[in-house]
């Protein structure tokens, strides 16, 4: 995935290397910012049709996730392809993308 290589180069160029456990904390933190945008824009659920999330926050979360994948030596593109194939198989088998597990 080109985006993963771009993030990896940025991390390397700016000496931002970190172990996976810190990368995971960053992913969760950035997703919290996305959730905050969503919660605030909907007046904490009172107006769900008004949901808005800033591109910047989504970008931060994507950066963090791609940096995590790189720190784990996981090819994000391959992982996404595997996930899409899994969802496709579930839809074909049951008509729904979820696993059916509680």
Which residues does each predicted region cover?
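Flexible "arm" and connector segments at domain edges
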Residues: 1-58, 62-102
